[in-house]
Every structure is written in C-alpha cells, then in structure tokens.
Amino acid sequence: MSKVARRRKVEGVKPKITHGLPVRARLKCADNTGAKLLMIIGVHGYKGRKDRVPTASVGDMVTVVVKRGKYDLMHKPFKAIVVRQRMPYRRKNGQWVVFEDNAAVLVNDDGTPRGSEFRGPIAKEAIERWPSLSVISAQVV
C-alpha cells in the first residue's frame, strides 16, 4: 500500500498544531466519568528520537493516568483525547486559538467517549479528527 493510500485511511486529517503538552503534563478531565485530574504518560502515534520527550496537542490521542477522582479509576491507564490546550496555536485562516486550561476527555479504544457529557468548550480540531465527540459536545470553538 502506498503512502498516499495509507493517508486516506486515517479517520480525520490532523492539522499542524503547536505541541504544548509533554509527557507528565497534568490535564483537567472535561467529562463526567468521575476523573478530575489526568496525567499524560504516552502519546499515540508519536515517532520521536532518543531522549526526546513525546508531546501532544489538540486532537491527539494520549494515554493518561487518573491522579484525582473516583477511587476505581485511580492509577490505571486510559486513553484520552486532548480537547483544549493553553499554548496558542494558529488555524489555517490566520486566527490564533488559546484556551484557559489544558483538558482531555476519556475515550474507549475505538475513540468513542466514555462519559455522557462534556464540560467547557471543545476545540474544532478535535471534533474534526474524532467525529464521535461531536455528538456529546455542547460548545465547539
């Protein structure tokens, strides 16, 4: 299979966004699963270099550990999608986007949300890349 054919199979095309969340960054949990504070322990699809810290941005799937929240969720790895980041990034139309906090939502392995509602605004880039998030999100920025 050629590289072009492989690119077409991707669920959503990822725009170039400034990476603002390295491994061990703390995120708010923006859904109602019972988790409050998350910590990134890995970035899915990151191909780096020796001794380089993997980083994530809006729309990336990351592996997280729940640091504060319900006891049955604590200290277990989950998959999450980053929906907000503090570091400014530029959209194709020239607009700069900045959020007040870093936030993610917990998802299953296939990218469907584990919670039934999202708190706060969700970045448009995350919705375009993961269409299953658009069903629950109330505010899209």
From Swiss-Prot:
SUPFAM superfamilies: Ribosomal protein L14 (SSF50193). Keywords: Ribonucleoprotein, Ribosomal protein, RNA-binding, rRNA-binding. The lineage of its organism: Archaea, Thermoproteota, Candidatus Korarchaeia, Candidatus Korarchaeales, Candidatus Korarchaeaceae. The keyword Transferase does not apply. The keyword Ribosomal protein applies. HAMAP family: Ribosomal_uL14. Part of the 50S ribosomal subunit. Forms a cluster with proteins L3 and L24e, part of which may contact the 16S rRNA in 2 intersubunit bridges. GO terms for cellular component: cytosolic large ribosomal subunit. This is Large ribosomal subunit protein uL14. CDD domains: Ribosomal_uL14 (cd00337). SMART domains: Ribosomal_L14. It comes from the Archaea. One of its GO terms (biological process) is translation. Belongs to the universal ribosomal protein uL14 family. GO terms for molecular function: large ribosomal subunit rRNA binding; structural constituent of ribosome. It comes from Korarchaeum cryptofilum (strain OPF8). Binds to 23S rRNA. Forms part of two intersubunit bridges in the 70S ribosome.
